[in-house]
Each structure stands twice: as structure tokens, then as C-alpha cells.
Amino acid sequence: MLENIRDAVRKFLTRSTPYEKAVDEFIKELQKSLISSDVNVKLVFSLTAKIKERLNKEKPPSVLERKEWFISIVYDELSKLFGGDKEPNVNPTKLPFIIMLVGVQGSGKTTTAGKLAYFYKRRGYKVGLVAADVYRPAAYDQLLQLGNQIGVPVYGEPNNQNAIEIAKKGVDTFVKNKMDIIIVDTAGRHGYGEETKLLEEMKEIYEALKPDDVILVIDASIGQKAYDLASRFHQASPIGSIIITKMDGTAKGGGALSAVAATGATIKFIGTGEKIDELEIFNAKRYVSRILGMGDIESILEKVKGLEEYEKIQKKMEDVMEGKGKLTLRDVYAQIMALRKMGPLSKVLQHIPGLGVMLPTPSEDQLKLGEEKIRRWLAALNSMTYKELENPSIIDKSRMRRIAEGSGLEVEDVRELLEWYNNMNKLLKMVKRRRGSIDKLFGGKIG
């Protein structure tokens, strides 16, 4: 059902419906789609309330149309719903690195063990699998088959019913064989609703193995029921993370993801299909981009990214005005690149000083002149060394000639850029702490 949101985004951005009406219709469709995906109703209405609150309190930056700005807010708040900026660390912190997988029966735990082994093997690690699920007769055979498929050794004792003993012996064997990563597939004999027994077993094996990571495997089809299981697991195992499987085969994936994210637990991977390589590192923003339709929102996100980068440079300039540091040509390059991401050249040029296009409505000739000057400056900057970008004072006539030749420009073009840069630094020192000076300097505030 989350695919409906993608259609809603496309309609919202392309139809000529009045803005306020279009916003109301979109929010209703968003609520409907999320609830249909088994996202908790309270979470849904909290999300849309935050979106409306931001619409009322914030003003759109000039580089975004109102509809684009609205979608950027939806993107931001949906990303928070599914975990925000939390970036899972999938790299082992030491070698050997022991991973213990736990999960209820039917969650796809054993298949995930194989996928995880393949993931790390492709990254150049020596991986071993331990079959310690003694309650499901086919578990060992399944893991052995997966291991053979991907060329990863599997340790198991089909006639031994002591899971802890198998786990310890398997880990010891692979440590002696100098394996980098050891993945232990534990018992999954309890169904949903029997989390207490599952967690008790997890603790017993954990105490015996002292693994470096404990990963809970959850089937996406349980939707928002994942909250209770993930919450109890997160409390019982502070080092634990979570893998959500079968995201491709259920409409409740959004419910499971949002439920787990609400607990504060880290979602490390999601399973996106049956194939051995269909396990991907979970990134909330990338997931939301898919929901909203990457092609439809890519240009919006690019503008927002440009604005964020510009604001970083603006902060640097404010520091320079207060006598902290100096603006470098690397900063100038970053500033121009950030502004270019923000949209039409007519808007970009109005925010760059010294290009002769500071009028509210530059003429076509002025725009062409400014565009050509930006092109030449970027070519010159791209031909400079790291030291030259960081310390332009070392650029003498000989270096100017080299930069000009490397960029296909005249020496005068390079000299013009350096003169503009020097004048910029002088001006920044002159205005110092005067509030608003930086906005005047750059032709008006962007954000």
C-alpha cells in the first residue's frame, strides 16, 4: 500500500489543484496508505500533525516552490518515522567477530544467516556458519545447503540436542581456523507471543558465547506487532540490532519498520527478496525516497542538499567576519557547487557577488555573462592543487600559467578569480560583526 504514496506525490507535484486543497488531499492519502500498511494509528496522526505544524511555523526557502517544500517536509518526517539519520554500523569492530542470530520460528532466520554470510564474504571476510538450531530438524540441512551454495563452511552436529554445546564448539573451531566472522544460527522454536522463552534462551546462549553482536530477525508480515518483540529484545540486549525479512512479500513492511524504529532499536538490514544477495543495509532516507518515488523527488532533495551545503559555507563566512579563520578557494568552490544545485541559473546568479547580475531581474545578456564566468571559475578551481585551494597566496605567475593551461583558460581569467577572492576576504574583514551583512553581500537570504 505504500506505493500509493508514490502516486500521490506525482499527482501533488503535477496537478494544478490549489495548494491548500492539494496539501489536505495528500495528507489524507498519506494517512490512509500508512494505516493500510499497518503503521500504528497514533504514529500516523503524530506524523501528520508534525507536518502540519511545520507548514504553519516555517517558511519555504526561495530556492523551492511551495509544493516542493511541502514534499521535502514529508520526506524529512517520514524518514524520522522509520529511524531518521541513524546509520547502522555493519563493519566488525574486531576480529574474530561473533554474530548471534535469534528469532521466532518462520521469521526467515536461517535464510538470513546465509545471506549475512554472503554479505560479509563479498566484503572480503572469511566467514563461518554455526548451525545451533536443534529444534527444527531441517535447520542444519538448510544451513549446510546455503553454505555450500556460497562457499562458506558450516559447523553442525545433527545428532546433538545441546544447542549451547554446539554453539561453543562451533565458535571454538572457527576461531582456531582463523575465521574473521562467525555467525551462529540459534533455535527458533517459539512462536510470536512466546517472547519470554525466546529471550531466556537468548540470554543463556549469550552468556556461553559472549558474542559481539546479537541480531533479532523479524518477519515484516507481523506489522506493528513487531513493537513488543523489538522493545523487549532491545531492553534485554543493549548491543543488539534487528533484521527485518520478507519486505518484498507483505503490505505490512512499513508497519514493522516504524514499530521497530519507535523502540529505538537499530534496524541493521532488511531482506528484500528470496535470492542470497537480497539483503541490504537499512537506510531510512533511502527507503523513504523509494516510497515517495525517487525520480519525482530527486531534484527536490538535490535543492535541499544544496541549501544545506550553502548554509555551512555561510556559517564559515560568519566566522571569518568575526576574525575566526579565513575563506579559502576551496570554500568558494563548495559555495558555487552548492548554489548550482539549487535550481535555475537566474536564481543562482543573484546570490553570487561580483558577477554583475545583482539586479532583481537580470537581463538575458547578464545571465549569459554570469554563467560563462562561473564556468571559467570552476574550470580554474578544478585545475588547482590542494595546497593552492587551501592557500591561494602561493599562486604566483608561474602557477597562474599552469592553472590556465590545465583549464583551457587565459591567465587573465585566473587573475580575475584571484582578485575577486582577495576582495571578498577584505570585504568580510570590513563588515565584521554587522548583522545582515552577509545577506546583503550575497544578494539576499536563501533560506
From Swiss-Prot:
Any idea where this protein resides?
Cytoplasm
User: Which GO MF terms are attached to this record?
Assistant: 7S RNA binding; ATP hydrolysis activity; GTP binding; GTPase activity
Database matches in SMART domains: AAA, SRP54, SRP54_N
Q: Where does GTP bind?
A: 103-110, 185-189, 245-248
- Which processes are annotated in GO (biological process)? SRP-dependent cotranslational protein targeting to membrane
Q: Which Pfam families does the UniProt entry name for this protein?
A: SRP54 (PF00448), SRP54_N (PF02881), SRP_SPB (PF02978)
Asked if the Swiss-Prot or TrEMBL record annotates the protein with the keyword Nucleotide-binding, the reply is yes
Similarity-based family: Belongs to the GTP-binding SRP family. SRP54 subfamily.
Function summary: Involved in targeting and insertion of nascent membrane proteins into the cytoplasmic membrane. Binds to the hydrophobic signal sequence of the ribosome-nascent chain (RNC) as it emerges from the ribosomes. The SRP-RNC complex is then targeted to the cytoplasmic membrane where it interacts with the SRP receptor FtsY.
Q: Which PANTHER family does this UniProt record tie to the protein?
A: SIGNAL RECOGNITION PARTICLE 54K PROTEIN SRP54, SIGNAL RECOGNITION PARTICLE SUBUNIT SRP54
On subunit structure and binding partners, the annotation says: Part of the signal recognition particle protein translocation system, which is composed of SRP and FtsY. Archaeal SRP consists of a 7S RNA molecule of 300 nucleotides and two protein subunits: SRP54 and SRP19.
What domain notes does the record hold? Composed of three domains: the N-terminal N domain, which is responsible for interactions with the ribosome, the central G domain, which binds GTP, and the C-terminal M domain, which binds the RNA and the signal sequence of the RNC.
Name assigned to this protein: Signal recognition particle 54 kDa protein
